[in-house]
Amino acid sequence: MKKLYKGFIMALSMFTILPTPYVEWDDDGVKNMMKFYPLIGLIIGVLWSIIYYLASILNASIILKSSIITIVPFIITGMLHLDGFMDVCDAILSRRSKEEKLRILKDSATGAFAVIPLVILFFLQFGGVYSILEKNSSLYTLILIPIISRSVVAYYLLSRATIKESTLGTYFKKGTNVYDKLIMIITLIITLIISVILLNIYGIILVLLMSLGIKLSVEKCRKEFGGISGDVAGFALVIGEVVGILILGIIP
């Protein structure tokens, strides 16, 4: 139990900016971190929904409310996944050789091919949130998105070969086993059931299209880089979540 607690605290401090008790980082904690990735998604989703509720009752324009709700998940995660999204976009859109793309992926410099997709991403996410607010959708639906995205991304991270140059991707997989992947599958099934209860048939569409968006993102990166990494996981997660927000914004 102590090892699981340590894994949870390590995961919470790694993937969010939320304050956590001090624990010493070691291999016992690392191998349990991924088990809690969907739970981290639940925590983010709950906080996101609370902000959605508070913003919705503000006497402010829908544009201001949408802006606040759009940036909340990125702030909670410390922009961690956005960094991966930008790095991957910069590498893929460079249209260089595989070796050069891998070099760009590790480069800390930010290029135009990273900034332009980021602007597009924010426009899409803002538009989806604006539509959700305009329809006065249930705040509970926002909780689903971070759970779905993290369950699917974690499954692929644990199931696919990592890029040799990826220290972070290898680090997250250290000591994991089939039970970790099983946790992701079970979590996704439970989330699917809850999605159907809240959204009827649209719940199935939400889970399937988010999962498809993540799968296509991962497979594209495997083709471009020869494997998956922490940056690739962040890229796929961001894609999956913007797909989810757009779906919630479109469905009646």
UniProtKB/Swiss-Prot annotation:
Pathway field: Cofactor biosynthesis; adenosylcobalamin biosynthesis; adenosylcobalamin from cob(II)yrinate a,c-diamide: step 7/7
Entry's EC annotation: 2.7.8.26
Organism (species): Clostridium beijerinckii (strain ATCC 51743 / NCIMB 8052)
Protein name from the UniProt record: Adenosylcobinamide-GDP ribazoletransferase
Biological process terms in GO annotation: cobalamin biosynthetic process
Keyword DNA damage: no
Catalytic activity, as annotated: alpha-ribazole + adenosylcob(III)inamide-GDP = adenosylcob(III)alamin + GMP + H(+); alpha-ribazole 5'-phosphate + adenosylcob(III)inamide-GDP = adenosylcob(III)alamin 5'-phosphate + GMP + H(+)
Biological function: Joins adenosylcobinamide-GDP and alpha-ribazole to generate adenosylcobalamin (Ado-cobalamin). Also synthesizes adenosylcobalamin 5'-phosphate from adenosylcobinamide-GDP and alpha-ribazole 5'-phosphate.
Location, primary (coarse class): membrane
Cofactor: Mg(2+)
Cross-referenced InterPro entries: CobS
The UniProt record lists the keyword Cell wall biogenesis/degradation: no
Coiled coil start-end: none
Localization, UniProt: Cell membrane
